[in-house]
Each structure stands twice: as C-alpha cells, then as structure tokens.
Amino acid sequence: RKNKGIDILMEAVAKIKQQLNGWKIVIAGIESDYTVVELNEMAIRLNISDMVDVVGGLFGDDKWDAYCSSDVFVLPTLNENFGIVIAESYLCGTPVITTKGAPWSMIEKYNCGWWIDRTVDELTYAIIDFVHTPIEKRRLMGLRGRQLVKERFASDIVAKQIVELYNSII
C-alpha cells in the first residue's frame, strides 16, 4: 500500500544502486494501492529492475521463510497502529529499518535496527549504514530485536498489562 512507503524504498535504492551491488530487494505483500505490475514498472523506470523482485503476498511458511532468510526488513511506513510485521521480523532475528510512522521508538533503546524520519534521504542513509555494518553486528541487532519482542510483547506480559490497565480504570 502507498502508506507502506514502497515508492520511498525504491527511490532510495535507485539513489545508491551502485553501493548495493549484489543485493536483492524483495518486495512482498498483498496488492492494494500498487499492483505487482505497477511496482515492476516503477522498478524499470528507476533502473533498478535487475535488483528488485516483487513477489506479492506471502503466507504461512513462505512468509516466515522470507523473514528468516532476509538480511534486513525495511518498512518505510507513513503510519502503523502497531506494525506486526516488525515484530514478526524480529522473531526471526532479522534487524529492521523502519520510519517514525511505526510506534517502535524502542528500536533505538535496544539497538536492534534503525528508526528514522520518513524521507528518501533518511532511508538512503539507513540502508548505507546497514550495508556497511559488519555481519556479526547485524546478527546481534537481530537477536536484540528478538529479545525486545519477547520482553515487551509476549502473551503473558501483554495479559498482565491489560489486567493492570483494567484495574486502574475501575
């Protein structure tokens, strides 16, 4: 969808195409504001079609395989209520680049990715920083992301928070 920022991602990739030699950008998700054809046309127009693979929606094991086999998950979103895809990515130990449209400021505290302003330039800098981050440090970022999700969003923790909220209201 347009609020997911796929256009911003593609523009950022186009700006630094030479620095991303050997990298593949996989765009997954159900069609909404953009169709697979429109995304492929955008990649052609930006001269990045050789490094962009638009796969459409992924479900079940295919979705989890994509998260777990990715080096980084990028979501330059306009706004998210939560951003379940960020949590899912972290559960696979994959670091995240997302924008401040997602309520994930704790990314900075946990040092498990990049939480940036939603601009092409900011995304460009974050991608470059990611590419230049040593593999072991990226792996540790992903593990810290997994720890973040387990500490903040495990079902028993969320249930306790709901009970506390309920008790504070009555």
Q: Can you say where each PLM-predicted feature lies in the sequence?
A:
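A conserved mid-protein helix/loop that constitutes part of the nucleotide-sugar donor-binding site
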Residues: R1-K15, I25, V37
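Glycosyltransferase donor-sugar binding loop
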Residues: K24-E38, G56
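Nucleotide-activated donor-binding/catalytic signature segment of Leloir-type glycosyltransferases, i.e.
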Residues: V37-L58
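Short alpha-helical donor nucleotide-sugar binding micro-motif in glycosyltransferases
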Residues: G57-L58, D65-S70
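Aromatic "clamp/platform" in nucleotide-sugar-dependent glycosyltransferases that forms part
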Residues: L78
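Short hydrophobic beta-strand element within catalytic cores of glycosyltransferases
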Residues: P95-T99
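Conserved acidic donor-binding segment of nucleotide-sugar-dependent glycosyltransferases
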Residues: W114-D121, D129-I135
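A short, well-ordered alpha-helix in the C-terminal region of glycosyltransferases
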Residues: E136-R152, Q161-E164
